[in-house]
């Protein structure tokens, strides 16, 4: 491996979720913000709910127009 070309790896990076949960992982970033984690994701909680962040269909229609 070449020296001095790799990013600095942090062994204790804080990850904060929109639900308020925080945990520590290793990463090249100082802090990470996520919308879903294992504490609030429907797959892990067993809840039946739709997870659609920022409406993908609406984003598509805004970008390309509603031609239908």
Curated annotation (Swiss-Prot):
<dbReference type="InterPro" id="IPR042105">
    <property type="entry name" value="Ribosomal_bL31_sf"/>
</dbReference>
<feature type="binding site">
    <location>
        <position position="37"/>
    </location>
    <ligand>
        <name>Zn(2+)</name>
    </ligand>
</feature>
<comment type="function">
    <text>Binds the 23S rRNA.</text>
</comment>
<feature type="binding site">
    <location>
        <position position="17"/>
    </location>
    <ligand>
        <name>Zn(2+)</name>
    </ligand>
</feature>
<keyword id="KW-0862">Zinc</keyword>
<comment type="subunit">
    <text>Part of the 50S ribosomal subunit.</text>
</comment>
<dbReference type="GO" id="GO:0003735">
    <property type="term" value="F:structural constituent of ribosome"/>
</dbReference>
<dbReference type="GO" id="GO:0046872">
    <property type="term" value="F:metal ion binding"/>
</dbReference>
<feature type="binding site">
    <location>
        <position position="40"/>
    </location>
    <ligand>
        <name>Zn(2+)</name>
    </ligand>
</feature>
<keyword id="KW-0687">Ribonucleoprotein</keyword>
<dbReference type="InterPro" id="IPR034704">
    <property type="entry name" value="Ribosomal_bL28/bL31-like_sf"/>
</dbReference>
<comment type="similarity">
    <text>Belongs to the bacterial ribosomal protein bL31 family. Type A subfamily.</text>
</comment>
<dbReference type="GO" id="GO:0006412">
    <property type="term" value="P:translation"/>
</dbReference>
<protein>
    <recommendedName>
        <fullName>Large ribosomal subunit protein bL31</fullName>
    </recommendedName>
</protein>
<keyword id="KW-0479">Metal-binding</keyword>
<dbReference type="GO" id="GO:0005840">
    <property type="term" value="C:ribosome"/>
</dbReference>
<dbReference type="InterPro" id="IPR027491">
    <property type="entry name" value="Ribosomal_bL31_A"/>
</dbReference>
<dbReference type="InterPro" id="IPR002150">
    <property type="entry name" value="Ribosomal_bL31"/>
</dbReference>
<dbReference type="Pfam" id="PF01197">
    <property type="entry name" value="Ribosomal_L31"/>
</dbReference>
<feature type="binding site">
    <location>
        <position position="19"/>
    </location>
    <ligand>
        <name>Zn(2+)</name>
    </ligand>
</feature>
<keyword id="KW-0689">Ribosomal protein</keyword>
<keyword id="KW-0699">rRNA-binding</keyword>
<keyword id="KW-0694">RNA-binding</keyword>
<dbReference type="GO" id="GO:0019843">
    <property type="term" value="F:rRNA binding"/>
</dbReference>
<dbReference type="GO" id="GO:1990904">
    <property type="term" value="C:ribonucleoprotein complex"/>
</dbReference>
